[in-house]
């Protein structure tokens, strides 16, 4: 059993998976902020955002992420929905899990 699968089986979740470099993360944030400006509003909870924007699709299909998912569920992976859950700093909003 690989380490990712073992952690998932033991804990039920995975943390600390290094997928993006800091520069990659900034690039995707810039894409998000530009899209919010171009679309005149927040993308918070906008469903299937990966259909209209390339950046979320690139994130969801990043090889490092897909390798981790595949190690848990196998190679048959379907991206059905991609949604941004946005919590801006120093706001009264919250994200409940």
Task: Please tell me what each predicted stretch does.
Residues 1-97:
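Non-heme Fe(II)-dependent double-stranded beta-helix
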């Amino acid at each position: 059993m690989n380490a990712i699968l073992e952690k998932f089986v033991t804990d039920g979740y995975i943390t600390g998976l290094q997928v993006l470099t800091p520069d990659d993360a900034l690039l995707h944030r810039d894409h998000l902020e530009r899209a919010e400006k171009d679309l005149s509003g927040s993308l918070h909870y906008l469903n299937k955002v990966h259909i209209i924007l390339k950046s979320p699709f690139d994130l969801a299909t990043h090889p490092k992420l897909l390798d981790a998912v595949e190690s848990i569920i196998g190679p048959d992976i379907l991206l059905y929905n991609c949604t941004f859950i946005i919590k801006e700093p120093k706001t009264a909003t919250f994200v409940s899990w």
